[in-house]
């Protein structure tokens, strides 16, 4: 079976890997402006607790470097920034330009871009050297990644 013939799940559909990437992009383009509100409503706000709970286990300290993959609008990045402090660095990546645009606007309004960088990048092929970060996180974005093994390697 060739790469083009390989089928993956997208909701209740079976689609090609390329088609899934395109469809996921279209979904997030269409919801980016309301993404934060949508997360709050769909999870009854519990996603905020889950993110805080996860970050209790990062081991991050002042001055460290963190990477958040599939960052969306940057909620997790703000919490990571609190852990690494002003002398640390947080890099947020997302494949979707609309989500990064919303995140950048929100973070700029909150005054949170000091030691934070946003980069459009595919989680399956990140442009970073190995062992460059003290901590790497990914929240709910993992469910939308086509090749999870590539993203997690």
Residue ranges and their predicted role:
Residues 1-25:
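N-terminal auxiliary segments of SAM/dcSAM-dependent transferases
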Residues 34, 44-64, 79:
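Conserved alpha-helix/loop element of class I SAM-dependent methyltransferases that forms part
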Residues 35, 136-137:
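Hydrophobic beta-strand segment of the Class I
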Residues 63, 133-134, 148:
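Local beta-strand N-terminus motif with an aromatic residue
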Residues 65-125:
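Class I SAM-dependent methyltransferase SAM/SAH-binding core
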Residues 124-135:
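A short acidic, Gly/Pro-enriched loop at the edge of an enzyme's catalytic core
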Residues 140-141:
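Short catalytic micro-motifs in class I SAM-dependent methyltransferases
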Residues 145-153:
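A short, conserved alpha-helix within the catalytic core of class I
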């Amino acid at each position: 079976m060739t790469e083009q013939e390989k089928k993956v799940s997208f909701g209740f559909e079976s689609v090609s890997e390329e088609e899934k990437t395109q469809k996921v992009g279209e979904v997030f383009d269409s919801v980016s402006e309301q993404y934060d509100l949508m997360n709050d409503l769909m999870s009854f706000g519990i996603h905020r607790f889950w993110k805080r709970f996860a970050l209790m286990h990062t081991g991050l300290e002042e001055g460290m470097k963190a990477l958040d993959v599939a960052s969306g609008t940057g909620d997790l990045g703000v919490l990571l920034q609190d852990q690494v402090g002003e002398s640390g660095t947080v890099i947020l990546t997302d494949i979707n330009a609309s989500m990064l645009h919303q995140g950048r606007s929100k973070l700029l309004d909150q005054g949170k871009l000091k030691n934070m960088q946003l980069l459009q990048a595919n989680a399956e092929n990140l442009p970073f050297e190995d062992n460059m970060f003290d901590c790497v996180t990914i929240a709910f974005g993992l469910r939308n990644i086509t090749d999870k093994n590539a993203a997690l390697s």
